[in-house]
Amino acid sequence: MHPFSRLFRNIQSLGEEEVQELLGPPEDALPLLAGEDLNHRVADALNLHLPTADLQWVHKTNAITGLYSNQAAQFNPNWIQPEFPELHLHNDLIQKLQQYFGPLTINEKRKLQLNFPARFFPKATKYFPLIKGIKNNYPNFALEHFFATANYLWTLWEAGILYLRKNQTTLTFKGKPYSWEHRQLVQHNGQQHKSHLQSRQNSSMVACSGHLLHNHLSSESVSVSTRNLSNNISDKSQKSTRTGLCSYKQIQTDRLEHLARISCGSKIFIGQQGSSPKTLYKSISSNFRNQTWAYNSSRNSGHTTWFSSASNSNKSRSREKAYSSNSTSKRYSPPLNYEKSDFSSPGVRRRITRLDNNGTPTQCLWRSFYNTKPCGSYCIHHIVSSLDDWGPCTVTGDVTIKSPRTPRRITGGVFLVDKNPNNSSESRLVVDFSQFSRGHTRVHWPKFAVPNLQTLANLLSTNLQWLSLDVSAAFYHIPISPAAVPHLLVGSPGLERFYTCLSSSTHNRNNSQLQTMHNLCTRHVYSSLLLLFKTYGRKLHLLAHPFIMGFRKLPMGVGLSPFLLAQFTSALASMVRRNFPHCVVFAYMDDLVLGARTSEHLTAIYSHICSVFLDLGIHLNVNKTKWWGNHLHFMGYVITSSGVLPQDKHVKKISRYLHSVPVNQPLDYKICERLTGILNYVAPFTLCGYAALMPLYHAIASRMAFIFSSLYKSWLLSLYEELWPVVRQRGVVCTVFADATPTGWGIATTCQLLSGTFAFPLPIATAELIAACLARCWTGARLLGTDNSVVLSGKLTSFPWLLACVAHWILRGTSFCYVPSALNPADLPSRGLLPALRPLPRLRLRPQTSRISLWAASPPVSPRRPVRVAWSSPVQTCEPWIPP
């Protein structure tokens, strides 16, 4: 049925004779539909013109919001954070792949080399203060969101996905180092790397000996003043200048010999008496209750000091203890192997105020609360004093490497959201690296084509058994170069700085440290920390400290990440396809699709791929593996042998939104944008396609409101209730050609020539489109040859609205191939000349697969290679089935 039959009959300004003419033969109706007067009259009847009156716009309809109605994000206190496996690709990935799949092609090697490791070096990077590390997107749950985000970052660090910044030039992480990280190793599993020791041996020997000698002399005799020591050193330096280089070497030798006598004879070391030399650099832990907090009353010293109680000195001992949570909740329980903090020996006053990554002394908030008197019933002292040992202030990973200069800043903020619109029980980390996508310093990301609807139909619309795989945490599989760490920094400002910026205490200019500290002691903070203590246990102390981390694996907030992930998965799909030429393998981002003729064969391929991927370090999410049978659900579509259709959930969503649209009310153009985005997903399956939404496009481009009339709304509902599948293209030879001039049209087939004239001159692109529609109506050919690039593109939104809708209805499922004007056999008939029939140019349609990185023509496997399936394949190997 004609898509405008019901609509034209409901328009009162159109007479019955005019309606019959518009719905009549296409050679008479199509030129009329291109007329400007008819389009204006229909637009007036449907009230499609933009409103000129100053009316109040509607800013919300159903779940669609527009201007001035931002939807507040919902925080879930019971969010479950995901657990990440040990994501570590094989160090020799390319060599390992060649063992499994044979020699790689040039394209496959190029794609893998882009990702191993990935490189990211923008032109300019903006650094933000650490206070912007965790975004306050949930004001009512600020503390809960702060600790949950910090815990998520520490979870990523434990999985080897993030680096932890120790200082400006060193990073630490957990897991196995890659080959490019071996060149920057400083420490591995607690041992200094050999190359690092050799580079520092000569420079550190003298400095270390001088430092130990000075500490030994000061501990051996308290009466020795620093002035005498400096005089002795100056005297020795004066002697060395007089005696020359030999005297200088003799002094260094004497120092080393004296140091050896100290270590072998007196056995007196820093902060400890009677210890063996093996325990010189060993961590000395003590009970958390043995520490007392004191303040330096001097005005010149702006730091605080720690004293170790002499009465409880016998209780302190050296030990290592796992960081276990005292929590009863099962929401967060990541294993952490942390050591206790180091404290000074009894009777020796020593400054152990924790230094931050810049070397600036910063006190520990937890210890300061522990050693002060409570200020009230809601003082945090009550929470801190409930445990003897809260663990260290920071941790160190298994591996420490050198890095470029990394400032104590961040380059992007982080926050948590729902994992997806259908799963609000789990959380997902969002990293805001939008600075690299805007401004004059924005990075121009590499472009890669996403498979369009016709490509999916050509590749996957077959009668096969289907299976879909999902790569677990796909982005975090791809390692990134350590040199890119200064550009991808995230972090936490710490509890004190975070809460100070939220509360009104920022206006308090009092320099009292106690008063600033006790500003945290409110009922809300106290109750929140009590609940968080049940969740995190003593890990709450670690989460309250500031830290800076850099990405070791590919983050999701950078525009480079989708491109690299597409290259990585497409290379894997290409290798699997070469070794199994009788199956279909397709990859889009982290989704892989396998297709085979029988379910038994598909099971064998699946088991082989799982074992190979696991050996390579690629983790597949087994819970998301789905067996679809003959109906593949992929990218929101249902793909069968008869074509592609949208899933039912999208159709129901569109129907619900269209029914809820108010009539005769000006809708905000932002609502039109979001509604158009939803309708566009299903528009290719309707009779009129995207052309039916052209009035909405015009309102959005003009940034004006749009009024839905009852006729236009009912017409859209009728279009979206009747959906047609997108079928796969066939490789056929073109036998029908069309051409047009502003005054006439012509059609050429293998057996006849047709021509005609228009009642009035038309634009050349409009005339060419009408000629193609006439050729499709009269010959029924699904492949037409034309010399007009506008018609070849298939984008009809630039034509008059009525003509574009009807042309999409006529040309649905029709393919085009280009023929030069000089070789177009319909060129002369379009000019009114009917020459003798001549042979048509032989043009064959190649089904569209687009220039996408997700599909590549792979050469078949050599027949001499052993088969990868243990049992005989049901498909004959002499005639392998090639995917379409």
Swiss-Prot record:
Belongs to the hepadnaviridae P protein family. SUPFAM superfamilies: DNA/RNA polymerases (SSF56672). Activated by host HSP70 and HSP40 in vitro to be able to bind the epsilon loop of the pgRNA. Because deletion of the RNase H region renders the protein partly chaperone-independent, the chaperones may be needed indirectly to relieve occlusion of the RNA-binding site by this domain. Inhibited by several reverse-transcriptase inhibitors: Lamivudine, Adefovir and Entecavir. This is Protein P. It comes from the Viruses. It catalyses: DNA(n) + a 2'-deoxyribonucleoside 5'-triphosphate = DNA(n+1) + diphosphate; Endonucleolytic cleavage to 5'-phosphomonoester. One of its GO terms (molecular function) is RNA-DNA hybrid ribonuclease activity. Terminal protein domain (TP) is hepadnavirus-specific. Spacer domain is highly variable and separates the TP and RT domains. Polymerase/reverse-transcriptase domain (RT) and ribonuclease H domain (RH) are similar to retrovirus reverse transcriptase/RNase H. The polymerase/reverse transcriptase (RT) and ribonuclease H (RH) domains are structured in five subdomains: finger, palm, thumb, connection and RNase H. Within the palm subdomain, the 'primer grip' region is thought to be involved in the positioning of the primer terminus for accommodating the incoming nucleotide. The RH domain stabilizes the association of RT with primer-template. Mg(2+) binds at residues 470, 590-591. Its EC number is 2.7.7.7, 2.7.7.49, 3.1.26.4. Residues 1-184 are annotated as: Terminal protein domain (TP). GO terms for biological process: DNA replication; symbiont-mediated suppression of host innate immune response. Keywords: DNA replication, DNA-binding, DNA-directed DNA polymerase, Endonuclease, Host-virus interaction, Hydrolase, Inhibition of host innate immune response by virus, Inhibition of host RLR pathway by virus, Magnesium, Metal-binding, Multifunctional enzyme, Nuclease, Nucleotidyltransferase, RNA-directed DNA polymerase, Transferase, Viral immunoevasion. Residues 398-639 form the Reverse transcriptase domain. Residues 299-345 are annotated as: Disordered. Disulfide bonds: none annotated. Hepadnaviral virions contain probably just one P protein molecule per particle. The record marks 68 as: Priming of reverse-transcription by covalently linking the first nucleotide of the (-)DNA.
